[in-house]
């Protein structure tokens, strides 16, 4: 059975390479694995080879989140010719979905004839998980598709082995293979011991295991507990280790939709003994309560308003090596700027600092791929820890002793541009800020807009 994987998942590339070698021994001549790490454009020869490998595959998994447009176009040229099973992950090429009797065509609305939305597909998959166990044909194929997507999203070596075995058993004619185990998936939210990536759900047990200390502030560290598209655990642990000397850290691994784990997240952040947290770091891209498929942003904003504490957003460069990042003038790609800086800012995030980037592992000549891993940028991790320590110290300082600068526009220098702002009455805004500072106990003087003009 020929498998072709076109993916942006770094862990999948690594583990599939290892599994290919194992399967050649365990199932000689029965499994052929072709891989393409689709994070950048390929040379013409490799692009043509990819198209042919897609067209001739018995099973194609397509995962093109953020892939270059030319790669996407080439993949779809191959899919147009493919007669095998096609498994799109996420929104990638959903119109080509085909697994046994289950296909995108069979799910199209009779009136609209459009490809089903991600929400529709999710509902049908959930239904098929139950019915597929007892009903043959299309329902079984729907259930299998749901399982295969879970195997891939949580791309451990065990899950990817089960992915291959399920396909070979149910679609490759190898019925002697035992039914693979269910996908090993993390909880929607849990407290993690980052030393061994084990997790607990009870706050008391976690505090005891992590040796929380009375009198220290508590800090929440949110991260993605699944390994798609990269395994961030090494970088998250580096942040955790840098914070632990001066605060109690709640390492909260999240997976799934925010609305599913919001109640439990609130209970952790507002724990009666160790909460409420004094500061939150969120290492996940996009917005707190919304991802690439959307969400309910107002839920995230409501939670952050309730906490009323600093909200920091360290992030990971998953498409650049550390060397590329150091040499780059811009630092971040446009897509990284959008999902890791602009969108978090809409939730009120501050200090969007890159703390990790990719490093290249030994080249895999057999599959012609360059495996990569995410690794911490030590200097930036230390900078984040320093910022956190200073924010925590600032929370303990009386307002009357705090020093604040208010910087207003004056460019090019001149009276006409002083406090400039298109369609804004900046003097009134600054006046109101000063009044609020006085009310909150800061050592300053409330000035009217007219008095501000006189001062400057």
Residue ranges and their predicted role:
Residues 1-456:
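An N-terminal assembly and electron-transfer interface module characteristic of large anaerobic redox
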């Amino acid at each position: 059975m020929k498998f072709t994987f076109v993916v942006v998942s770094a862990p999948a590339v690594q583990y599939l390479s290892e599994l290919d070698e194992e399967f050649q021994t365990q199932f000689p001549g029965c499994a052929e694995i072709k891989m393409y790490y689709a994070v950048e454009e390929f040379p013409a020869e490799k692009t043509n080879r990819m198209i042919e490998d897609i067209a001739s595959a018995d099973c194609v998994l397509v995962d093109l989140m953020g892939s270059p447009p030319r790669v996407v176009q080439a993949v779809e040229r191959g899919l147009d010719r493919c007669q095998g099973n096609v498994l799109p992950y996420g929104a990638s090429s959903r119109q080509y979905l085909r697994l046994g009797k289950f296909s995108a065509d069979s799910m199209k609305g009779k009136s609209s004839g459009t490809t089903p939305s991600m929400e529709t597909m999710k509902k049908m998959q959930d239904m098929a998980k139950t019915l597929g166990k007892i009903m043959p044909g299309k329902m079984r194929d729907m259930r299998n598709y749901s399982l295969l997507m879970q195997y891939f999203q949580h791309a451990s070596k065990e899950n990817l082995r089960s992915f291959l075995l399920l396909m070979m058993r149910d679609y490759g004619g190898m019925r002697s293979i035992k039914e693979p185990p269910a996908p090993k998936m993390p909880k929607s939210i849990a407290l993690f011991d980052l030393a061994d990536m084990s997790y607990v759900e009870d706050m008391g047990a976690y505090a005891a295991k992590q040796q929380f200390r009375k009198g220290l502030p508590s800090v929440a560290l949110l991260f993605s507990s699944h390994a798609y598209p990269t395994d961030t655990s090494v970088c998250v642990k580096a942040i955790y280790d840098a914070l632990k000397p001066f605060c109690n850290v709640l390492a909260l691994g999240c997976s799934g939709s925010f609305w599913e784990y919001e109640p439990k997240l609130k209970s952790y952040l507002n724990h009666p003994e160790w909460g409420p947290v004094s500061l939150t770091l969120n290492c996940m891209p996009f917005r707190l309560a919304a991802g690439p498929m959307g969400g309910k942003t107002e839920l995230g904003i409501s939670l952050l308003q309730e906490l009323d504490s600093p909200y920091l957003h360290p992030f990971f460069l998953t498409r650049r090596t550390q060397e590329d990042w150091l040499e780059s003038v811009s630092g971040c790609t446009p897509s990284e700027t959008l999902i890791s800086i602009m969108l978090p800012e809409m939730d009120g995030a501050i200090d969007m600092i890159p703390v990790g980037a990719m490093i290249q592992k030994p080249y895999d000549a057999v599959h012609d791929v360059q495996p990569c891993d995410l690794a911490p940028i030590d200097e930036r991790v230390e900078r984040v820890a320093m910022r956190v320590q200073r924010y925590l110290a600032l929370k303990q300082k009386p307002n009357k002793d705090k020093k604040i600068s208010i910087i207003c526009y004056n460019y090019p220098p001149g009276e006409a541009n002083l406090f400039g702002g298109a369609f804004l009455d900046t003097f009134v805004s600054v006046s109101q800020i000063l009044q609020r500072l006085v009310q909150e106990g800061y050592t300053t003087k409330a000035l009217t807009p007219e008095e501000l003009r006189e001062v400057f």
